[in-house]
């Protein structure tokens, strides 16, 4: 086949294929153009998720007839010149997006320059038939895209259902809206308003907070830590959720570089590392994080759609983001999710009925078979009258008891005022500690709470010094289910030795343990080794030391902690609560589950209609 030049329309269609994948891609390019045009209001109208019609209207600076004619040509832009190539502050090349979109659709652009007398219009079908005419329009630009991909039917076949395509477009608009809280946005689909976001004109932090509430929700802000971190070349701000407020996917993670939404692996890994002590591997935090970086230190042109970026010093950026998130979480370390208490109160209002074990009968306190009956006056009158001395002793003892009770009540009142988690009042099902504060009831999971305390304590030991080893009087032989698990533990024996565990191979499937960390006390060695083997066998020999330490610390903490089912005295319960108040990140266990929930008195009173 003879080599030949491609036609201009074919070149444009190929270029469009790199950038324009679906209606959401068109909306992204055109809305970013509107942002770059200094717009304060951007309206988006869609029909059939954008397959039939996309209209983007803005009140930006607009274009003259000459600019309009040039804007739809390839390799033209109003956004920068050659000297700015390493210092890009805009979101795209107006002269790149428009011809690419025009090549695969029927496009109509109407625009009026600010303070101009006339508006102009240009119409293109498949990128051809370019003709500028005089029109009527307000200041700004309106772009209509009809019959997207009509010129590339193969691409049209691969579009998803309207619902899926619409969700992608809504996601794009939300991301851009988060980055520009001063701009008003509206999104209408098939005549139905889906988004209406009012532009904010207060200080930057207030603007961002309100836009996040409008886009992500008020619950997120209530359960999020504010990030404010600065260096000479970087600044990081935004909100990231408390570990107990998490999701099953990373869909609600909004990351921005110089106000540009990105889905960058480096940033996602940094986010995962920052939360690795607080969340299970299958749970994800929610965040809206904005990194402002010297444009010369980041390349945004790595990907045609600019979804990925390249940093001059990626490790430095990664470490800064981890530090910024951890600092923010530390400041919110004792707080558990506010929605957990709300969910608990909803369960009180609408209790779940267990159909497997229905209540067999209702006990009537007046029936003969009742287990409890109120004491009658006749019973009280049966006290013998001839024990005068005993009565005197009882009275004196009673006075002493009353004084002790009063002292204890006064002490508890001080605790309720002074401490966030209040004074322990009871232990429920030998698993949950019930405590009282000035205006709430706190329910604490004793195992989850103590596990968190143990995790932080062991982690501190591992950072500052080697764990003190405790030699077993009689070495423990642990038989594992298979040779693979035994080999895995043995392969890591040198690393485990530094973590306080001394072991040797004993036969094909067994391990002999001679020393354990002193901090674990009287631990079940069999269970400890089996749990460690389960954790590590999935990773084999190639597990990194940091990851190994994470797994070992988690296993140690689990065996160190108070188990559910253990009865605690009032002093032990209060001691646990005080330790929680003095330990960072005690509001959740290291899987992101809450260690306590707080039920406000006003909410409890509402349950009773008070």
UniProtKB/Swiss-Prot annotation:
Against CDD domains, the record matches this protein to: HATPase_MutL-MLH-PMS-like, MutL_Trans
What the entry lists under Gene3D superfamilies is as follows: 3.30.230.10, Histidine kinase-like ATPase, C-terminal domain, MutL, C-terminal domain, dimerisation subdomain, MutL, C-terminal domain, regulatory subdomain
Keyword check for DNA repair: yes
**Keywords in alphabetical order:** DNA damage, DNA repair
One GO biological process term is:
mismatch repair
GO cellular component terms given for this protein = mismatch repair complex
- Tell me the GO molecular function terms: ATP binding; ATP hydrolysis activity; ATP-dependent DNA damage sensor activity; mismatched DNA binding
Q: Which InterPro entries does its entry note?
A: DNA_mismatch_repair_CS, DNA_mismatch_repair_MutL, DNA_mismatch_S5_2-like, HATPase_C_sf, MutL/Mlh/PMS, MutL/Mlh/Pms-like, MutL_C, MutL_C_dimsub
PANTHER family (UniProt xref): DNA MISMATCH REPAIR PROTEIN MLH, PMS, MUTL, DNA MISMATCH REPAIR PROTEIN MLH1
Q: Which family does it belong to?
A: Belongs to the DNA mismatch repair MutL/HexB family.
Q: What does this protein do, in the record's words?
A: This protein is involved in the repair of mismatches in DNA. It is required for dam-dependent methyl-directed DNA mismatch repair. May act as a 'molecular matchmaker', a protein that promotes the formation of a stable complex between two or more DNA-binding proteins in an ATP-dependent manner without itself being part of a final effector complex.
The identity of this protein, by name, is: DNA mismatch repair protein MutL
